[in-house]
A protein has these predicted regions:
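Cytosolic juxtamembrane N-terminal segment immediately preceding the first transmembrane helix
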Residues: 1-150, 159
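Flexible cytoplasmic loops linking transmembrane helices in multi-pass membrane transporters
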Residues: 100-130, 336-415, 428-442
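Helix-breaking motifs and short loop linkers at transmembrane-helix boundaries and internal kinks
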Residues: 146, 162, 194, 215-221, ...
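Extracellular/periplasmic helix-loop-helix junction of adjacent transmembrane segments
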Residues: 151-181
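C-terminal transmembrane bundle
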Residues: 173-176, 188, 211, 226, ...
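Conserved MFS/SLC helix-loop-helix module at the cytosolic interface between two early adjacent transmembrane helices
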Residues: 181-220
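Glycine-rich segments within core transmembrane alpha-helices of 12-TM secondary carriers
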Residues: 252-301, 542-552, 560-561
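Central mid-sequence intracellular linker of multi-pass
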Residues: 259, 280-366, 571-595
């Protein structure tokens, strides 16, 4: 058992474990991703670099300040490593890892990180990456499995413990508090302890406290345990997303959008279990069986991650800890698992950075340095570069506004959807004698399951539309259109949703569009910003999203009236405001290389 745990948490990789994957550097171009795909290499690109740079210099505008100048190409998906054979030399690699910012003194860590990126790009997508896609998808799955799971228990908690419909919404506040804490702590912990530990433990913590909540004797204990469960599930998206991105070749970057398809699947599974258990058991048993079941499902996902899959530690993390030999071994391991070849060695890494313009800062980054660096992401000195020019400042402000608005607007409706469905969704139904004032529990949970099914294709469509060449689509267009339609159907739900059938139609369309919205938003945001400011920009966006999400249940619990319509109107207004912000964003990242 001790040896097994050591292999999962503390195993040190070695290139000697992966014999047969290394090829000489001079043969690397035969094994590149572009060569295997039959794409033409750039011929004589080295001689054209000067002209390309001159063209860029002559057409420089504010977008150049953002770091988003790109070479024109008929094929928008061409990768950064489509080099000719001459560029697979030490000198060629030196030029390639230093391009983009002339005159800059690169650190040893930065150059080696870029070289590892190139090696992973040459290996391309393979068995290991697709397995990781599924296992990281478990994180997205668990996130919505539990967010919707808590929402689905609210009517039962209210009835069993004698809590009013408004008061029981504080249960969601407990969950969001845990999500906020977990998101911050696990994101930071992954930089200090490594991705592998955080990747495995988040689902374990979620399953333990989630299952314990099924045995809670009273409502305060339920809230407390849901909050602890949230500290685990809150780490899934930041940890799993970062891990997947660090193993993802640039040419397959659209898979980051496709990863979001697991999110509505989590909602679907949660709604199906709730429909079965809550409608077929007494009120004090149904929700408990439901919570225990999704707790077991989460534990099974942990077992698959921890027991059946050997996860490589992130090579970027290993490099930051001064463990260069292990970082190289991980790249060899990826090539071995994908049945591909690689040219990366420690000697190549050292030779590429061995120039006078390299800043010889220590490669190893201490835990204290990581902590200081993460905390500095929220300092004014680190945020100030995000407003260094008008276009970048406007982009930053708008994307943060969108994240904050959606962070509050989404839970105001979705976190309490089972409640809205259970009593007609609007005051109109209660006033009109011809319309039913409420739906049966069976109708409520059946409709919720149908709504969940309707949302799944949204993420699949998002992955296609983000790269569509239409001027009205792409990242920005798809995001704005889906957000606008979501807001419209929220308004229609509260004004015309006087019957369960009407509610079902409006909410199904709304769920479909919101899954497109979230799928694009998670991929679009990190693409907007250049690498030097990407961490600060996305970190603040995530923080604002969680904080406003924490406020949403407090508003819903204390808003005047019966709480059936005002929260939905407010949700629609916030989503509509986010749409306005998206339209004003001055950047489209479709077909552009990540900087």
């Amino acid at each position: 058992m001790k040896r097994f745990l050591r292999s999962r948490f503390a195993r040190k990789e070695s290139v000697h474990d992966y014999i047969g994957v290394l090829v000489p550097l001079e043969e690397a171009h035969f094994h590149s991703h572009s060569a295997r795909c039959g794409k033409a290499e750039f011929e004589g690109r080295g001689s054209d670099d000067g002209n390309a740079n001159a063209d860029l210099d002559g057409d420089e505008d504010e977008e150049t300040a953002l770091g988003t100048s790109y070479k024109n190409s008929d094929n928008e998906g061409e990768g950064m490593l489509q080099m000719d054979a001459a560029e697979y030399t030490i000198e060629g690699l030196r030029r390639d890892v230093r391009k983009g910012e002339p005159g800059r003194r690169w650190t040893e860590y930065e150059l080696k990180s870029k070289l590892i990126n190139k090696a992973i790009q040459d290996i391309g997508m393979g068995r290991y990456n697709w397995q990781l896609f599924i296992l990281c998808g478990f994180g997205w799955f668990a996130d919505n499995l539990w967010m919707q799971g808590v929402s689905l228990t609210l009517p039962s908690l209210s009835e069993e413990f004698g809590v009013t419909e408004k008061q029981v919404r504080y249960t969601t506040s407990s969950l969001y508090l845990g999500l906020s804490i977990g998101s911050a702590l696990w994101g930071l912990g992954a930089d200090i302890m490594g991705r592998r530990i955080a990747f495995n433990l988040t689902l374990l913590i979620t399953s333990i406290f989630g299952t314990l909540a099924a045995y809670a004797p009273n409502w305060p204990t339920v809230c407390f345990l849901f909050g602890l469960m949230g500290t685990g599930v809150g780490g899934n998206l930041p940890v799993d997303g970062a891990l997947f991105l660090e193993f993802l070749p640039d040419a397959s970057s659209s898979l980051l959008t496709l990863l979001s398809v697991w999110w509505p699947v989590g909602q679907l599974v949660s709604s199906l279990f709730a429909w079965y258990f809550i409608t077929n058991w007494p009120v004090d048993q149904g929700w408990r069986l439901f919570i225990a079941t999704i707790g077991i499902v989460t534990f099974i996902m942990f077992i698959i991650r921890f027991g059946l899959f050997h996860l490589f530690e992130s090579p970027k993390y290993l490099l930051s800890q001064g463990r260069q030999s292990e970082a190289v071994a991980v790249v060899h391991g990826i090539a071995y698992r994908n049945n591909k070849k690689t040219w990366l060695t420690e000697e190549v890494l050292d030779a590429v950075v061995d120039t006078e313009d390299t800043e010889r800062a220590p490669v190893r980054v201490s835990a204290r340095s990581v902590l200081k660096q993460n905390l500095s992401s929220f300092s004014l000195s680190h945020i100030q570069p995000l407003f260094q020019n008008r276009k970048l400042g406007l982009t930053t402000a708008l994307i943060w506004f969108c994240w904050a608005s959606i962070g509050m607007g989404y839970p105001l409706f979705n976190a309490f959807l089972p409640q809205y469905l259970s009593h007609g969704g609007s005051e109109v139904s209660a006033r009109e004698s011809s319309a039913p004032a409420s739906a049966t529990p069976a109708e409520t949970y059946r409709n919720y399951a149908i709504i969940s099914i309707a949302g799944v294709p949204g993420s699949l469509l998002a992955a296609y539309l983000v790269d569509h060449k239409s001027p009205f689509l792409g990242r920005k267009g798809t995001l704005a259109i889906s957000t606008f339609v979501s807001a419209v159907f929220l308004y229609l739900f509260v004004t015309l949703g006087t019957t369960p059938a009407a509610q079902l139609f409006f909410t199904s369309v709304e769920a479909f569009c919101q899954n497109i919205m979230y799928g694009v938003l998670y991929a679009f945001t990190p693409e907007i910003f250049p690498a030097p400011v990407r961490g600060a920009a996305t970190g603040v966006a995530s923080f604002l999203n969680r904080v406003t999400g924490l406020i949403a249940p407090l508003l819903a619990a204390n808003i005047p009236g019966d709480g059936s319509t005002a929260p939905i109107f407010l949700s629609a207004a916030l989503i509509l405001a986010a749409f306005v912000g998206m339209v004003l964003i001055p950047i489209e990242t479709r077909g552009r290389q990540r900087l």
